[in-house]
UniProtKB/Swiss-Prot annotation:
Compartments it resides in: Cytoplasm
Protein name in UniProt: NAD kinase
Reaction(s) catalysed by this chain's protein: NAD(+) + ATP = ADP + NADP(+) + H(+)
Pfam families linked to this entry: NAD_kinase (PF01513), NAD_kinase_C (PF20143)
Main enzyme class: transferase
GO cellular component, one term: cytoplasm
Species of origin: Streptococcus agalactiae serotype Ia (strain ATCC 27591 / A909 / CDC SS700)
Lineage: Bacteria, Bacillati, Bacillota, Bacilli, Lactobacillales
C-alpha cells in the first residue's frame, strides 16, 4: 500500500477573508509533513471548510457527487454557524481531534430536487438547506401535491421546501418550525400566500415524512425562479418540481468538540440568559 493509500486525504476549502486564510495556512502547515495525512482536493476523505455556513454550502456542492466517501468539518471565522464545530481560535483542537479520528460520523438528510420543463428536459439537483420556487413578475399559482394527493392550490409569491438543517435559515424567517437535523423529514413553507374570502391555503408549515414526496405544479406559463441553496436559476415553463429526501446524506466528522444542535440554536437566536 503506498503513502496516499495509507494517509487520510484532506481538502482545505476557505473563503477569501484574511482570518480564513490564516486558519488555512495553519492547517496546511500542520498536515503538510504528517505521514498520516495527504493534502488533496481530489477525492478527499475529509473536507475542512473555513469561513461560514455559506462556505460549507459551497464545499457541499463541490463534493456532492462524492457524499458516500467524504466527511465534512467546519471552522467558523465569524459568528457561530450551524455547520461549524470549531472557531478560528480552536484550530489546535481540530488538528488534535483529526489526528485521533476513528472515522465516526454524524449524518444529516439532504433534499433531492427534480425539475421537469415543458420541453421534456429534466434537471436534477441536491440541496443541503432548501429550495424555493417563485414567480417574480406575477402571482404564482400552483398545485401542491403531497404523496400524489392534491393538497392545495397555492397563490402567492412562492414556496420553500427545507431540510431539517435548513429549517433554521430562510424557513425560520418565514415562520416555519425548527427541526432537529436527525429527523428525516421535509418542511414545506408558504411565501406570502394570498388568503381571503376567495382564495385559501393552509397558511402554516407542513412537515412531510421521509417516505412522502412533494410536487409543485405551476398552473401558468412563464419564467420561474428556482433557488437551490445559495444558487438561483431561471426556467421558462416549468411543468413540475419534485422534492423528496435524497437517498444520500451529508456526513460530518464526529469529534469530542461536536456542538449539539440545540446549543447552536441557542447561540444563534437566544443567547445566554440574563442573571
Amino acid at each position: 500500500m503506498n503513502f496516499t493509500d495509507r494517509a487520510t486525504r484532506v481538502a482545505i476549502i476557505a473563503n477569501g477573508k484574511y482570518q480564513s486564510k490564516r486558519v488555512a495556512s495553519k492547517l496546511f502547515a500542520a498536515f503538510k509533513h504528517d505521514p498520516d495525512f495527504y493534502l488533496s482536493k481530489k477525492d478527499p476523505d475529509i473536507v475542512i471548510s473555513i469561513g461560514g455556513d455559506g462556505m460549507l454550502l459551497s464545499a457541499f456542492h463541490m463534493y456532492e457527487k462524492q457524499l458516500d466517501k467524504v466527511r465534512f468539518v467546519g471552522v467558523h471565522t465569524g459568528h457561530l454557524g450551524f455547520y461549524t464545530d470549531y472557531r478560528d481560535f480552536e484550530v489546535d483542537t481540530l488538528i488534535n481531534n483529526l489526528k485521533n479520528d476513528e472515522g465516526e460520523q454524524i449524518s444529516y438528510p439532504i433534499l433531492k430536487v427534480t425539475i421537469t420543463l415543458e420541453d421534456g428536459r429534466v434537471i436534477r439537483a441536491r440541496a443541503l438547506n432548501e429550495s424555493t420556487i417563485k414567480r417574480i413578475e406575477k402571482t404564482m399559482v400552483a398545485d401542491v401535491v403531497i404523496n400524489q394527493v392534491v393538497f392545495e392550490r397555492f397563490r402567492g409569491d412562492g414556496i420553500l421546501v427545507s431540510t431539517p438543517t435548513g429549517s433554521t435559515a430562510y424557513n425560520k424567517s418565514l415562520g416555519g418550525a425548527v427541526l432537529h437535523p436527525t429527523i428525516e423529514a421535509l418542511q414545506l413553507t408558504e411565501i406570502s400566500s394570498l388568503n381571503n374570502r376567495v382564495y385559501r391555503t393552509l397558511g402554516s408549515s407542513v412537515i412531510i415524512p421521509k417516505k412522502d414526496a412533494i410536487e409543485i405544479v405551476p398552473k401558468r406559463v412563464g419564467v420561474y425562479t428556482i433557488s437551490i441553496d445559495n444558487k438561483t436559476v431561471h426556467y421558462k415553463n416549468v411543468t413540475k418540481i419534485e422534492y423528496s429526501i435524497d437517498e444520500k446524506s451529508i456526513n460530518f466528522v464526529s469529534t469530542p468538540s461536536h456542538t449539539s444542535f440545540w446549543e447552536r440554536v441557542n447561540d444563534a437566536f437566544i443567547g445566554e440568559p440574563e442573571h
